[in-house]
C-alpha cells in the first residue's frame, strides 16, 4: 500500500527581500513559485538571530537553519554558547584548551591556532581567537602561530586585509602570537574532497610551501592587486618557523563542523589517503565535535543533544523518511537536521547526489538540482515514504559567488524543480511544504554597488500545498510541528515550536 507523503522542500538561501536590481529572486522568472504563492496558504518565517538561537541580529546559516527545522525548537547555537563562556570565565578553564597549551609548555612545542579569520559568525568569530591568545599569554606560552583562513563569503570579499591587520595588532597588544600562514577558505575549508585544494593548504601549514611573504597584510594586498579576493587567496607562508610539526598542539577555533572535517582528518587520521602526507602525533583540539568518528582529537565544546527531533520521532513511530540533497548540502539534511548526530535512524533512507566539479558555482548555476529532482520525484512516486526532506542548494551556493546573473539562473532552476516535486507529492495525495533555511540570493549587491556574498537576516517563505488552511507568521522551529500537525500526529514534549496552521 502506497504511503501518502509529506514533502518538505528547502530552497537553501532563498530569502524574501525588497524587489530591486540586486535581488536575484525578484529578477528571476519564477512561474511555479508565483503560482504556488497565488494558489496556496503561505507566510514568512524568521530565520536569524534569537529566533534560531543566535545573537540578536546575527544572520542565519545552513547549519543553524537545518538544526532548528529538524529540531522543532529553538536550538541554542555554539557561537553564543562559547561567547558566554568567555564572559563568565568558563572558557579559560576548558579542559581541552588547557591540555593543548600545557602540552606545549611540557614539550617545548608550538601552539597553532587556525580557523576562519572573520566576524561573520557562521563558522567562527575573531573574538574566540582573541580569547585563545589571551589564554596562551596568561599561561606563559611563547611559540604561538596563527594560520589565518580568509572568509569573503560570510563577510565582504575584500574584508580580509582588515581582519589580518587587526590580528597583527591584537597579537602585539596581547603580547603573543604571529601569523604563520594566510590563505582563502577555498583551500583550507573544502568539504567536497577536492584534495588538490586542501593539499595546498596543508603543504603551506606543515611544510612551509607556497608563496613567501613575511608581511601578511601585504600578502593580502598583493592578492587583491592580482584580482583575487579573500576566499580564493592562494596560501602564503609568512613565517617559515611557524610550520606544524611533531608534538605541536593545534586548536581549530571554527565551531561549525562541515568545513572543518577534511583539514582536521588530514592532520590527525593515520588512515587519511586524500593526498600524500606525513603523519605525526599532535594534541589536536576541535572547537566542537566535527565528526564522532574523528580519531586522535579532543573536543572543547561537546554538542548538546537535540532529543526527539523530527527524524528521531518519526522513526520511533515506525514511519519512513527520505533525506535527499547534493553534496554541498547533504550534511545539512542528515547530520544537522538530526541535531548534529551521525545517527541514521531506522526507516530513514538517504540519497546523495554529487555536486558538479567546477571551480565556482556561477560557472554551473544549475548545479545538480535536476538530478536531485529526478531522484526525489522517483522516490515520492514509489509510495515508500511518509516524509521526504529535500534540499536544493543553488540559491545559497551560487549566491555566495556574488555573480547576480548566475544567481538569477539558480533561482529559475530551483523554481522549475520545485514544481516537479510538488506535482509528484500532490499526485500521491500528499502535502508539500516549501521553505528556506536563510536568505542569500535576494540580496546580491551591497549598497555601494559591490557584490554581496553573505547571507542576510531576511525572513524566508513558507508555502503549504495540498491543505487549504490559514497560516500565521513564525520561525524555523515551527516547521516540524506543522509537519506533524498535517500528519495528524502530536508533537513530542521536547519540541517547543508551534504549528503554523491557524485553528
Task: Please tell me what each predicted stretch does.
Residues 1-503:
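Feature captures the catalytic ectodomains and active-site-proximal regions of enzymes
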Amino acid at each position: 500500500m502506497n504511503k501518502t507523503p509529506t514533502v518538505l522542500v528547502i530552497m537553501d538561501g532563498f530569502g524574501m527581500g525588497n524587489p530591486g536590481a540586486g535581488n536575484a529572486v525578484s529578477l528571476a522568472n519564477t512561474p511555479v513559485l508565483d503560482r504556488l504563492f497565488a494558489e496556496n496558504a503561505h507566510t514568512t518565517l524568521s530565520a536569524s538571530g534569537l529566533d534560531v538561537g543566535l545573537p540578536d541580529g546575527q544572520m542565519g546559516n545552513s547549519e543553524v537553519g537545518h538544526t532548528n527545522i529538524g529540531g522543532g525548537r529553538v536550538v541554542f547555537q555554539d557561537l553564543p554558547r562559547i561567547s558566554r563562556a568567555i564572559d563568565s570565565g568558563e572558557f579559560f578553564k576548558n579542559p581541552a584548551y588547557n591540555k593543548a597549551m600545557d602540552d606545549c609548555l611540557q614539550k617545548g612545542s608550538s601552539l597553532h591556532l587556525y580557523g576562519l579569520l572573520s566576524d561573520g559568525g557562521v563558522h567562527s568569530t575573531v573574538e574566540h581567537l582573541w580569547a585563545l591568545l589571551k589564554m596562551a599569554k596568561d599561561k606563559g606560552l611563547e611559540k604561538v602561530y596563527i594560520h589565518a583562513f580568509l572568509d569573503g563569503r560570510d563577510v565582504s570579499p575584500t574584508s580580509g586585509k582588515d581582519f589580518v591587520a587587526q590580528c597583527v595588532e591584537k597579537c602585539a597588544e596581547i603580547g603573543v602570537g604571529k601569523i604563520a600562514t594566510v590563505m582563502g577558505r577555498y583551500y583550507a575549508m573544502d568539504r567536497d574532497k577536492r584534495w588538490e585544494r586542501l593539499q595546498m593548504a596543508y603543504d603551506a601549514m606543515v611544510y612551509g610551501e607556497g608563496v613567501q611573504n613575511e608581511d601578511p597584510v601585504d600578502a593580502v594586498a598583493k592578492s587583491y592587486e592580482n584580482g583575487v579576493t579573500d576566499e580564493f587567496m592562494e596560501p602564503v607562508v609568512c613565517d617559515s618557523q611557524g610550520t606544524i610539526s611533531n608534538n605541536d598542539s593545534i586548536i581549530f577555533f571554527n565551531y561549525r563542523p562541515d568545513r572543518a572535517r577534511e583539514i582536521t582528518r588530514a592532520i590527525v587520521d593515520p588512515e587519511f589517503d586524500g593526498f600524500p602526507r606525513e603523519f605525526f602525533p599532535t594534541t589536536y583540539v576541535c572547537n566542537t565535535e566535527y565528526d564522532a568518528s574523528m580519531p586522535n582529537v579532543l573536543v572543547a565544546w561537546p554538542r548538546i543533544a537535540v532529543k526527539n527531533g523530527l527524524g528521531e520521532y518519526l522513526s520511533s513511530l515506525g514511519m519512513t523518511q527520505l533525506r535527499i540533497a547534493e553534496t554541498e548540502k547533504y550534511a545539512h539534511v542528515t547530520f544537522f537536521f538530526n541535531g548534529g548526530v551521525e545517527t541514521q535512524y531506522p526507516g530513514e533512507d538517504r540519497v546523495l547526489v554529487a555536486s558538479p566539479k567546477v571551480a565556482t558555482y556561477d560557472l554551473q548555476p544549475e548545479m545538480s538540482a535536476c538530478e536531485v529532482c529526478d531522484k526525489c520525484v522517483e522516490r515520492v512516486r514509489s509510495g515508500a515514504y511518509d516524509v521526504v526532506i529535500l534540499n536544493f542548494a543553488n540559491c545559497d551556493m551560487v549566491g555566495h559567488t556574488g555573480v547576480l546573473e548566475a544567481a538569477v539562473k539558480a533561482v529559475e532552476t530551483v523554481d522549475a524543480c520545485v514544481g516537479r516535486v510538488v506535482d509528484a507529492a500532490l499526485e500521491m495525495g500528499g502535502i508539500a511544504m516549501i521553505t528556506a533555511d536563510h536568505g542569500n540570493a535576494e540580496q546580491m549587491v551591497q549598497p555601494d554597488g559591490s557584490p554581496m556574498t553573505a547571507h542576510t537576516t531576511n525572513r524566508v517563505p513558507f508555502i503549504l500545498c495540498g491543505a487549504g488552511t490559514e497560516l500565521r507568521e513564525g520561525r524555523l522551529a515551527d516547521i516540524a510541528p506543522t509537519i506533524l500537525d498535517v500528519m495528524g500526529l502530536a508533537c513530542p514534549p521536547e519540541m517547543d515550536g508551534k504549528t503554523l496552521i491557524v485553528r
